[in-house]
């Protein structure tokens, strides 16, 4: 029986097979090499935002996952009070510098979409690191999707949004007008673990 020939598509920007896409130019996903200290912080933050959004097509082939990722990035940059969320979990008042945490987060996402086979003959530690980043991002987006569904399907959706996305009351106690359900407990546990991971590796996921 003849084997099925592998599919390979060559474009100006990439080499595409049935399993992988090899990008010829990566520069648009990375921050420029010149000194960012000469640029005001708001402009630098916008530069990071654009690079996170550019990674969207590489996150998944599934439209739902890509849409969840886009919503997540927009929320992180435009709505979330990360310092409040961090304080509720760690008790730390002092803020971390924003730009270094964005850089670490960008590196994390780039690793998650970069594939290297895990074999002894190839750089195993790098491959394993990329795999772990990919698994964490997959879990993060799964929980983000569940949060959105949880908020949208409840009659008290706006109240849930305030609780989960603005005030983060699910991280501190169950003394609110909403029943502290098992689903809220899942969000509590995941968000606490995510914040603690950020503290460990310097990200802002």
Curated annotation (Swiss-Prot):
Keywords: Sporulation. GO terms for biological process: ascospore formation; double-strand break repair; mitotic recombination. It comes from the Eukaryota. Involved in sporulation and maintenance of the mitochondrial DNA. Is probably involved in a pathway contributing to genomic integrity. The gene is IRC19. This is Increased recombination centers protein 19. Disulfide bonds: none annotated. Belongs to the IRC19 family. It comes from Vanderwaltozyma polyspora (strain ATCC 22028 / DSM 70294 / BCRC 21397 / CBS 2163 / NBRC 10782 / NRRL Y-8283 / UCD 57-17) (Kluyveromyces polysporus).
